[in-house]
Amino acid sequence: MTAKRILIICLFISMLFCLPSKAQKPGDIVSEQTIRQLGEKHFFSISPIPDEIFHLMQGKTYKKNCTVARSELRYLRCLHVDKDGRKIVGEMVVNKAIAADVLDILKKLYEAKYPIERMRLIDYWDANDERAMRANNSSSFNFRFISHTHTVSKHGKGLAIDINTLYNPYHKRLKNGKDVVEPATARPYLDRSKHHVYMIKKGDLCYRLFKAKGFRWGGDWKHSKD
């Protein structure tokens, strides 16, 4: 083997090592080197719902009685940072009307290293809110009607966003005095005077960014908290 051939082979091998690893999937931790090589913009995108994602949603978030057209929804990809500083690929399905605003918010949260533990499609939990919330997942679209009505909920349209759901639970006190907490494992986090890195506090960055885009915060609701 000539020296020239050896040099070409060595250059080829070195190029292979310099290339980023296979395409990053939602939930994957991404190295700083990969982000530098590909650029942050590579990880932030809005697209129509891809076929493989729409197939995953069938019978889960996109139920048989879903009245929201596929064309009304958008698939977001982003990066988010967990409490340990790891940079993770996230994904979310939202209504196209808010897609650009939500991606802008998620990018700003990432840049500020605002901690978000998990951001996967709730379809991986079979669209079961309780299970996904126990996993502290952040998500949006999950088709459903408001209880005892024919009105599609905000989540059912992909117009509501839940962030760090275990530490920011839904809480309502019924007239009989019973407390409804979702997820049920979130009772320790009802006391909002306590601090946890995944708690959203009124006035913090997550609160301010969503409010600036016209979102209402569930923590401000009078008859329930979300």
Can you annotate each of these PLM segments?
Residues 1-8:
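Bacterial N-terminal signal peptides that target proteins for export
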Residues 8-17:
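Bacterial N-terminal signal peptides
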Residues 19-23:
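Sec/Tat signal peptide C-region and signal peptidase I cleavage site
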Residues 69-72, 152-158, 209:
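Extracellular/periplasmic catalytic domains that process cell-envelope and extracellular macromolecules
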Residues 116-117, 131-166:
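Mid-length scaffold segments of soluble, non-membrane domains
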Residues 146-148, 161-226:
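Catalytic cores and adjacent binding grooves of peptidoglycan-active enzymes
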